[in-house]
Amino acid sequence: MDTRAVDEITEQNERYGPEEIIRRCGSPLTSQAIGPKLAWLRRHEPEVYGSTSRWYMASSYLVHRLTGRYVLDHHSASQCTPLYDLAARAWIEERCDEIAPGLQWPELVWPSEVVGGVTRDAEVLTGIPAGTP
């Protein structure tokens, strides 16, 4: 388990309040949460962060490679404490801008949604027919 973002967890708990984080996001901050990880990257790897425009979970990366869409399902987004509002089912934009400025955020979709078809480029790489949902 990656525990490098311990300081960032402490800072975000102090900034937003642990009870408020749980109320709004549904879970406490842990070393697995996206917010502290992005803050750690920004602080400790500024060159890498500066050359980053998007972040991906494994599922969203695969969907992007196959369809060209930058999306994340709501279930996965619920692991993005303190950046995802569970009740509103939306990114908490002010926190996203504060913790990870300059990054694009994936469009939120439901796990059952068809978000696109396999592209021609992905067909060449995978053998999956273009247009396959």
Regions found by a protein language model. Give the residues of each.
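Active-site phosphate-binding/coordination module
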Residues: 1-35
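Gly/Ser/Thr-rich active-site cleft segment
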Residues: 22-133
